[in-house]
Amino acid sequence: LLESRGLGDVYKRQVENTGEPTNFSVPTGNFGDVYAGYLAKKMGLPINKLIVATNQNDILHRAISKGSYEAEKVSETISPSMDIQIASNFERLIFDLNNEDDKQTSLDMKNIKENGKYLIGDDKLNKIRENFLSASLSENETLEVIKKVYEKFSVVLDPHTAIGYGAFDKHNLRGNNIVLATAHPCKFPDAISKAINLKSDLPKELEFIL
């Protein structure tokens, strides 16, 4: 709840700054931040689409694009916060799709636990797509986005934020578009060096920890 309120404020400020319905691309592995945006939309904030942006551990992308929420083997990537196959916050969306039927949701989650799979029916999938789009990026695509943004804007993105940016590029929605940034690039020196051959310096306020 606290996370939803805090992130709801973030969404609210951004929409107020534009004055028009806005699309958000949200880097996510566990479906928490993007679900907060969904709650903000349900409460009346004029959000158009929420893009679920993830890496090659793409269970959320497969759920939204194909209607199959099915766990696969986790791959280690340069965006480790997304190295997840079962997104715990997705249960909240299932609960909402079940019209807040806790018993049905409990059965669905039990089925996921036992079989590693949840098939989303057409009606529920259409409801999801009214609010969400999705995209996944490979390792090479993520590195290319970091390079592209640096060359175009002289801004260094961390791998997670790069996935959010790349997911937006894949959909290229009209209107106001905002990519949520996540971590400081200095946390991912190997990825940054590989993408643009640059060392991302530690912020001065954090230098004391080393």
Each language-model region and where it sits:
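Single conserved hydrophobic/aromatic residue that forms the stacking wall/gate
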Residues: 1-11
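Conserved active-site and cofactor/substrate-binding residues in soluble primary-metabolism enzymes
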Residues: 5, 32-35, 84-92, 137-144, ...
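Hydrophobic alpha-helical scaffolding
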Residues: 5, 26-30, 58, 79-86, ...
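Alpha-helix C-terminal capping segments
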Residues: 13-16, 35-46, 166-172
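A conserved active-site cap/scaffold subdomain adjacent to cofactor or substrate pockets
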Residues: 22, 26-103
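Catalytic phosphate/nucleotide-handling subdomain of diverse soluble enzymes
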Residues: 45-62, 165-210
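Long, amphipathic alpha-helical stalk/connector segments used for oligomerization, subunit docking
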Residues: 103-120, 128
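C-terminal structural cap/anchor segments
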Residues: 117-172
